[in-house]
Amino acid sequence: MYKNLIIFAMALFLTLGASAQNKREFRGAWIQCVNGQFMGKSTQQIQSMLSKQLDELEKDGVNAIIFQVRAECDALYESQLEPWSKFLTGIQGQAPNPYWDPLAWMVEQCHKRGMEIHAWINPYRAKHGSTSMSQVSKNSVVVKQPKLCFSYDNLVLLNPGLQESADYVCKVAADIVSRYDVDGFHIDDYFYPYPVAGKQIPDQALFQQNSHGYWNIGDWRRDNVSRFVKQLGETIHHIKPWVKFGVSPFGIYRNKRNDPNGSETNGLQNFDDLYADVLLWVNNGWIDYCVPQLYWEIGHKAADYKTLITWWNKHAGKRPLFIGEDIERTAKFADPANPRSHQLPAKHKLHQQMQNVKGTVLWYAQTAADNVGNIGHTLRDFYWKYPALPPLMTFLDNKSPKAVRSLKLKWTEQGPMLNWKAPKGKKWGDVANRFVVYQFKEGEPVDLNDASKIIKITYDSNVKVPYIKDGKTTYIVTALDRVGNESKGKKKKIKF
């Protein structure tokens, strides 16, 4: 009896917390390749595994996938610039057999489920620590252009101090963005290497040769990375202005002991250790969204989650702020205020309290799909029960598309189907990219701000609707442009 009361109380708590969901929210999940989940599997097995992940993530309410397509200057897509990834086929430079293009396939699969897809690259890493030099392809930049690289511990990296390195990465990015219908382009937290005790970055001579006027090597390194980030964003937007450029930095910018404006934390720092001045990029508008990786728990002694989400909310609000969440750690640790619960309810509450936090990215997709700690099902049943539109990015485009045309009900073998035509538009900002379908039962007020009335967000121009026997049902369909601006609604009343 007591156990049942606890379960009831927990469900009631979650239900109350989910009663007012955000209509716009980034709900992402990272799908990585470096964990080896694709290695040793056939094309069919990989596609089956990814399909199952995407199906579960769609049920969980995820609306964006961040898919790793470049781990070590390699490719999980057809490329003339870099070799096929060993994390796909087991051998760097070897094409998949049977042949397929994972990025092209993922674009199709994500859009079929109404999800955005963001292509994720590691910008500087040229050889992963798990890859031996004998495994490096002759077509790798490590072999073809070794002067662009330096070794550090068991890694090989493109040298951020060389403009040729920035140009090389931007060329790769331009190739991806121009050939694939991606909604976003994403780089992770690996800039200058994570420091290893007793190891020095071998760029002293380069600094002395070309310091760009800096006296301090740390300032010079930060400038190298910042100029690259700015160039990369400009490269992407020159080709496709609607592609969202995002960064997922390490979770601590600076500790307060190093900077009065830093966080009350004691850990590795973006600014000082990775030479990544993330706030400069945010405040100058060089990136379109920021996803600090806050993988710690509430109550962590060195890097408390509550301290960090509050800090990022205060300092990084000039661009949409999403929070990187570690599912396994969230499930592992109890809520300090409610020891019978994992930390998802408390973290969700913090998200709702932060004005500048516009979404979440789950680390990592497989753990959500496997429902580790019941996190995935909690999202689908409570916090992400209804679909969500992407956060607005008015700095990219602030004009809504025109309304959909010719909204009609048709009967098909699958049952009743709503069909419509996309609005006409000549410029990219006027073209409809997705559609939102709202359903209002008889007597319900028609309110497009009510997220609970969204039944589908789709890239298609049709949607199957349920057969409702009694009363009239009102459907409203709106169009979204490439950035997510929403049109006025087109209404259709139906009585079966």
Where are these regions (language model features)?
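Aromatic- and acidic-residue-enriched segments that line the glycan-binding/catalytic groove
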Residues: 75-90, 125-152, 189-212, 256-268
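Active-site-adjacent "subsite" loops/lids of carbohydrate-active enzymes
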Residues: 24, 32, 36-48, 119, ...
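Active-site neighborhood of glycoside hydrolase catalytic domains
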Residues: 164-172, 178-187, 191-294, 299-318, ...
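Pro/Thr/Ser/Gly-rich low-complexity, intrinsically disordered linker/stalk tracts
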Residues: 374-429, 484-496
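Solvent-exposed loop/turn segments flanking beta-strands in beta-repeat/beta-sandwich domains
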Residues: 423-450
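Catalytic domains of carbohydrate-active enzymes, especially glycoside hydrolases
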Residues: 48-75, 179-183, 280, 286
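Substrate-binding cleft of secreted/luminal carbohydrate-active enzymes
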Residues: 275-301, 317-395
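Beta-strand-rich modules
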Residues: 465-487
